[in-house]
């Protein structure tokens, strides 16, 4: 065990690091709130134009991943309720579930998780990597020239969630 002075230095360094992490989280939360407000203003203050999700997104697109192949798996517990990055993954043989790649957006389809905001924007995979997750996810992928992050902000929009909960 280090002497008391060394322990105090370690505690001080640890506190500095955790304070920085908390500050960066607040900055990220503020940036996401700003982006969401901009998104809302841009897309929900316009004339009402009806369209389906299939008109603007690829919904549950096919992604190549054979059964038994080792791949990263993102369980429901890894989807955040705020922020966009999943909190972890495991590697295991693929035996079913939705498949996705970088640029795809995931949203939970089951009511409690949808209400709680379980969603993620996937941007942490290696190039060309296909991952998989719960059959209770809906995957949105970019269609035409729509930026892939559009779908993340769409699913984080309270009007969209309220609409989705009706089904």
Regions found by a protein language model. Name each.
Residues 44, 112, 116, 157-161:
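Short, well-ordered loop/turn and helix-capping segments at boundaries between secondary-structure elements
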Residues 34, 77, 110-111, 138, ...:
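Anionic group-transfer/hydrolysis microenvironments
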Residues 54-108, 113-128, 133:
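Sequence-specific dsDNA recognition surfaces
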Residues 4-66, 82:
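Non-catalytic DNA-recognition/assembly elements of restriction-modification systems
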Residues 1-8, 53-64, 129-167:
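Basic, amphipathic alpha-helical recognition segments used for DNA target recognition
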């Amino acid at each position: 065990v280090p002497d008391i002075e060394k322990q105090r230095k370690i505690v001080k360094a640890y506190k500095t690091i955790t304070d920085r992490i908390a500050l960066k989280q607040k900055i990220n939360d503020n940036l996401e709130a700003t982006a969401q407000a901009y998104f809302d203003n841009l897309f929900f203050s316009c004339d009402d134009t009806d369209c389906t999700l299939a008109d603007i997104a690829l919904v549950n697109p096919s992604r190549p991943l054979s059964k038994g192949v080792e791949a990263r798996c993102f369980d429901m517990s890894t989807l955040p309720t705020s922020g966009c990055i999943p909190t972890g993954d495991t590697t295991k043989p693929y035996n079913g579930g939705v498949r996705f790649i970088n640029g795809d957006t995931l949203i939970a389809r089951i009511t409690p998780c949808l209400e709680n905001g379980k969603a993620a924007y996937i941007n942490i995979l290696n190039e060309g990597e296909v991952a998989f997750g719960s059959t209770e996810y809906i995957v949105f992928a970019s269609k035409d020239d729509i930026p892939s992050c559009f779908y993340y902000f769409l699913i984080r929009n309270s009007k969209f969630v309220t609409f989705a909960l009706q089904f």
